[in-house]
Amino acid sequence: MFSALRHRTAALALGVCFILPVHASSPKPGDFANTQARHIATFFPGRMTGTPAEMLSADYIRQQFQQMGYRSDIRTFNSRYIYTARDNRKSWHNVTGSTVIAAHEGKAPQQIIIMAHLDTYAPLSDADADANLGGLTLQGMDDNAAGLGVMLELAERLKNTPTEYGIRFVATSGEEEGKLGAENLLKRMSDTEKKNTLLVINLDNLIVGDKLYFNSGVKTPEAVRKLTRDRALAIARSHGIAATTNPGLNKNYPKGTGCCNDAEIFDKAGIAVLSVEATNWNLGNKDGYQQRAKTPAFPAGNSWHDVRLDNHQHIDKALPGRIERRCRDVMRIMLPLVKELAKAS
C-alpha cells in the first residue's frame, strides 16, 4: 500500500433528446459550462435516479461527449434506498441508475477521474415531498447542473490536448441516495485501475455558496494535498478569485478536508481526492451544510433540494450574474490545474 501511494504521489508531482452544438472552444472560460448547465437544468428537471429524466439527461451527456470526439458510454446499475411514509413505515425503493463515462486517453496507464453527479434529489419521505424537497420539477442548477457544465467544458477544452496521464470524465448517478453511482464505479474498477488512479476530482454545488472551497480527502497524503488543493488555491489567488479550504472549526471535519459527496467513496478506498464546492464552512454547524447567510431569498441559508430555490430563475434574481461568474472562476482554476496534473503537452 505504501509503495503504491508513493508511486501516485511521485506521478502527480511530475506534472505540476436535445443536443447543443459543440464549438471548437468557448469565447471565454465558463461560457460553455454556463450554457450547458442552464440547458440541463431547464430541459431535464427531476433527474432522480432511475427516472426517465435521468436516463434522458445521461443520454444527452453521452452525446455531448461523443460530439467532442470522445468514446463514451452509459453504465447502468441496480440499487435501492429506503423511503419513509407519513406513518413512519419504511419500504425499499428499487432503482436503476445511469452513469456516463468518457475517456481521454493518455500515454501512460495512470489516470485522473473528474466527476460530477447528474441526479437530482428524490424525496426520501412523505415529509420531504410535503416540504417541496426533490421531485419532478427540481432543476438542480446548483446541485448539480453547474458541476456537469464545468465537467463538460473541461472535456471540450481538453479534447485535442495530448496528456501523459489519461482523464476519465464521469457523470455519476445515485449520489443523492447515498453515493450509489460512485460506489458502483469503484466496485467495477480492477485493482490495477485503482492503483493507477492518481486523483479523483469531484465537482458539486458550485453556485449558491458564498465562496469556492477546495478540500482534500482525509486519507489524501500531504504531498498530494500540496499538488492539488494548495495548487488550486494558488491559481485562484493569481486570478484574484476568492477561494479557500475548510478551516476545521468542526472537530468532525479536519482542516483542509471535505465531506459528504461522491469523493468520500474513493477517499475511504485510499485514493487521493479533491472536492470542489461552494459553501461557507464558517456558518451554522461549521460542517459546510449552510452555504450562505440566511436571507429572505435563502431562508435556511442554503438551496439544498428545494424546488423553489435551486433553479436558475431564482438564482438569477437573488444572485444576479452568479452562475456565469462562478462557472468562469471554476474554469479559470480547474483547467490549468488539470493540465498540470495530467501533464498536458
From Swiss-Prot:
Entry keywords, A to Z: Aminopeptidase, Hydrolase, Metal-binding, Protease, Signal, Zinc
GO biological process: post-translational protein modification; proteolysis
Residues given in the record as Zn(2+) 1 binding sites: 117, 143, 204
Listed GO CC annotations: outer membrane-bounded periplasmic space
Pfam families per the UniProt record, alphabetical: Peptidase_M28
Signal peptide: 1-24
Keyword Coiled coil tagged: no
Residues that, per the record, bind Zn(2+) 2: 143, 176
InterPro entries the UniProt entry points to: M28_fam, Peptidase_M28
EC number: 3.4.11.-
GO function term, MF aspect, one: metal ion binding
NCBIfam families in alphabetical order: PRK10199.1 (NF007568)
Function summary: This protein, presumably an aminopeptidase, mediates the conversion of E.coli alkaline phosphatase isozyme 1, to isozymes 2 and 3 by removing, one by one, the two N-terminal arginine residues.
Recorded family membership: Belongs to the peptidase M28 family. M28C subfamily.
Protein name, as recorded: Alkaline phosphatase isozyme conversion protein
